[in-house]
Amino acid sequence: MRSAHTVGQVRAAEGELMARLPEGTLMGRAAYGLAAVCARLLGRVYGARVLVLAGSGDNGGDALYAGALLARRGASVRALLLSPERVHTGGLAALRAAGGVVTADQAEYGTADLVLDGIVGIGGRGGLRPDAARLAGAARRGTLVAVDLPSGVDADTGEVAGAALRADVTVCFGTYKPGLLVDPGASYAGVLHLVEIGLSLPPAGLTALQDADVAALLPVPGAESDKYRRGVVGVAAGSEQYPGAAVLAVAGALRGGAGAVRYAGSAAAEVVRRHPEVLVSTGTLAAAGRVQAWVVGPGGGAGAGERLDQALAGPVPVVVDADALTELARRGPQHGGPPLVLTPHAGEAARLLTEGGEPPAAEELSAARLRTARRLAERYGAVVLLKGSTTVVAQPDGRARVNPTGTSWLATAGSGDVLAGLLGSLLAAGLSPFDAASVAAYRHGLAGRRAAAQGTPITAGEVAAHLAVVA
């Protein structure tokens, strides 16, 4: 599992460690790890052209000390000082002692084999200064390595207020930063490398599951399991206008780990034709039989409100998706009732956050994905799976997970229906709402990648089919 810590948490841990270590030890550890990554990227260090972009403070110092280490191995290292009056004097002295030189020629940015971005550290806010912003749009041929964080990206949120440097590799010290895992910041970070420097950190408020974490969470039938012990998921989806949504939601549910799927709705004939193993009914949700979780809303049309009422009247967890989200936004937060998992995209999130007047712009919410997911979770007292370029799962206490899988090809009709069904099935199989949403997003993203392996458009049905090979 990847864990990310806020700037405040990192600063506190650094302060505690520096109080126990000789002066300069912590920066030395960071610089050594940074230089080691750069050496691997260069392959041959001797004769390589390296440009250090050094801002003020410790971030620039890390870059300068790393540049000095590379210069000692024969690299031609030049430093472009973005804040000469506030440069880290120890780092600059070390670079010069190793044979590095200071340059004022920004054209070297485009010719270096490797560029170290040490302009702004994790405390930076509000975008880059004009001289640094010019570099963000300049052409370069070499590899850009960000020191702890690409300059221009907010470390805590991933927001990008203006110009930012787009890194090929980001070397993180001590822990990942939230802004490296969440778009838009994640799209500027490139490949992440973590360098341990000995920090003692509290539990992380933001994490990202990896393969082993998901494997440990997935339900595995025991020797005495039957379909009822494994859990039964109910799907209330589809309408005369959108019967395919029911078929796709059921397809996702069948791959989620529950022992059986019950369907309640007007698309019963289409569902049983495609999935004969499903138990179907056309009456109320209560008449469908006992379930351990409900999925309500995909393609529900005008009937989504009635279905939502029926699900909220019961005790089992409810996945609220699509048209049911629109109905929930109209009503506002619900107090009491069963556990909810909301699955909005940015447009639905905007409606859910509207408190009279105009809704917030979906584009603004997308640019602040972590903050948006947490606001929704707190407002509705529910786990929220905010879909998008980076899917974020948040719960009301502020803890969140970022999904590291997926592909832009998943932006296709019906993909969300498959995800909702998969999520409901994992809930019925016994996972907590937070774990079920996290695992569903992960598996859905992997299935999308597999389906799009040839780099061509995919359908939601293909995503559902590929869930079978990413269990």
Predicted regions and their residues:
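Small-residue (G/A/S/T)-rich helix-start motifs and N-terminal tracts that mark the onset
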Residues: 1-79, 114, 167-169, 178-322, ...
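Nucleotide and nucleotide-moiety/phosphate-recognizing core
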Residues: 36-119, 127-147, 317
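Internal gly/pro-rich beta-alpha loop/helix module
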Residues: 113-114, 119-205
